[in-house]
Amino acid sequence: MSRRALISVSKKDGIVEFAKKLEDLGYEIISTGGTYNLLKESGVKVIKVSEVTGFPEIMGGRVKTLHPKIHGGILAVRDKKEHLKDLNDHGIVPIDLVAINLYPFKETISREKVALEEAIENIDIGGPAMIRAAAKNYKYVTVLVDPVDYEKVIEEIKLYGDTKEETRFYLAAKAFGHTAFYDSLIYEYFREKTNMEFPKVITFAYEKVQDLRYGENPHQKAAFYKNPVKSYGIAECLQLHGKELSFNNINDANAAIELVREFSEPVAVAIKHTNPCGVAVGNSIYEAYLKAYEADPVSIFGGIVAFNGKVDVDTAKELVKIFLEIVIAPDFEEEALEILMSKKNLRVLKLKEGYYREFDLKKVEGGVLVQQKDEIDLDESSIKVVTKRAPTGKEMKDLKFAWKVVKHVKSNAIVLAKDGVTVGIGVGQVNRIWPTEQAIKQAGERAKGSVLASDAFFPFPDVVEAAARGGITAIIQPGGSQNDQLSIEAADRAGIAMIFTGIRHFKH
């Protein structure tokens, strides 16, 4: 008795060769629509699904395979007498292999300004039903959703007369993943068009970009996945030069890109272990980089530098003077790129324009925390001067600069800035005075005349008192402590201007 295969694919890579090999191995081929036409034109003896079902394709192809003679053939358990009786009574022929991939929903919604009606017409109904049926009945049916598996299946059939059960189980798992991914894309597309910000059930579809050499540490396996439709940022960077990106490279580069995005004026950002170690704005990218380097010439070594403008020759010449892991920018002058590429191991990334507002996810054991991204802008109307002295124009400019930076520093965080440059950064301490002392110590003499930004309020006046001793002249912080008045009084005694934003920027 010949075996039967059902083939219906939107991605037709390798499908003709696969069908011909199945035919040579004694399989009867049934198919639908465009796949049927392609196979027939290519010389494959193929039967139309409508000939099997005795029912024509209707509604413009919306209904083709949703029929007992198809699903009964796929789902029949071959060693159950009642199933075999049903097959015989209703003239249903078992289907032993199903090769299907689905309507191009992802590709459709990835295009700009796609009408809802077009997206809906690219939601596959019959395909997922057949895939799931075949995967459920993996003990008897081989299901293929990926052309990469065609050759393995052919080889096993040649060797054993059928695929091995362990192979069918693996392919079934892959098939269920395929339909789950497909349904997640559809769900996310529809969810975005509603007000379901935090729905009862949430799914996210990501596809693998690459396997990584290892994770955060060499003993951890890792891979990188991206949003297949609304991808941006590090996931869409074009690598122009250098070694393959590591797990830590990607994580650090992401932090650099997020901080760079805060600024419209030319900015240079140096990142180490996801924290900024030097940030500066300037009249040009070149000036910004020189200032960012001088902010902390020790920590920048082995770090990542990102820009929001085209890297020129002068900047490239400065960049190659030290060891850096990555340089990121939206563009590079041709000669500048050649200079950077002279460093064999330097990774050079071109940042793609565009941004998509999505959830911020934090994995915890047994669950996931979902929140809006911390993207609130500092509203001028929310700035409240709480001290007797208001900041000068220069101080206010530096305060706003420091406020943008402190948002991207691990809490508890303090940033000192002067003339559009960070001069001291206190990172990730368990109280607020320690990062203050850390930042002041790093700044040294540069602390005098600088401003201070804090990601959260001051529970005690000790931060203000330390700032006064360091020569800091202005402070920006959220406010909201029950001891705010003590900090205000300390600032007034020292002649420090202080403003409250009403916004906290914890980062964990």
Curated annotation (Swiss-Prot):
Domain named MGS-like: residues: 1-145
Keywords per UniProt: Hydrolase, Multifunctional enzyme, Purine biosynthesis, Transferase
Hydrolase is among the record's keywords: yes
GO biological process, any: 'de novo' IMP biosynthetic process
InterPro entries documented for this protein: AICAR_Tfase_dup_dom_sf, Cytidine_deaminase-like, MGS-like_dom, MGS-like_dom_sf, PurH-like
GO cellular component: cytosol
Catalyzed chemical reaction(s): (6R)-10-formyltetrahydrofolate + 5-amino-1-(5-phospho-beta-D-ribosyl)imidazole-4-carboxamide = 5-formamido-1-(5-phospho-D-ribosyl)imidazole-4-carboxamide + (6S)-5,6,7,8-tetrahydrofolate; IMP + H2O = 5-formamido-1-(5-phospho-D-ribosyl)imidazole-4-carboxamide
Keyword Hydrolase: yes
Pathway the protein contributes to: Purine metabolism; IMP biosynthesis via de novo pathway; 5-formamido-1-(5-phospho-D-ribosyl)imidazole-4-carboxamide from 5-amino-1-(5-phospho-D-ribosyl)imidazole-4-carboxamide (10-formyl THF route): step 1/1; Purine metabolism; IMP biosynthesis via de novo pathway; IMP from 5-formamido-1-(5-phospho-D-ribosyl)imidazole-4-carboxamide: step 1/1
An MF annotation (GO) of this entry: IMP cyclohydrolase activity
SUPFAM superfamilies: Cytidine deaminase-like, Methylglyoxal synthase-like
EC number: 2.1.2.3, 3.5.4.10
Gene3D superfamilies tied to this protein: 3.40.140.20, Methylglyoxal synthase-like domain
Family per record: Belongs to the PurH family.
Free-text note regarding domains: The IMP cyclohydrolase activity resides in the N-terminal region.
Family matches, as NCBIfam families: PRK00881.1, purH
UniProt xrefs under HAMAP family: PurH
Name under which the protein is recorded: Bifunctional purine biosynthesis protein PurH
Native source species: Caldanaerobacter subterraneus subsp. tengcongensis (strain DSM 15242 / JCM 11007 / NBRC 100824 / MB4)
Gene symbol of the encoding locus: purH
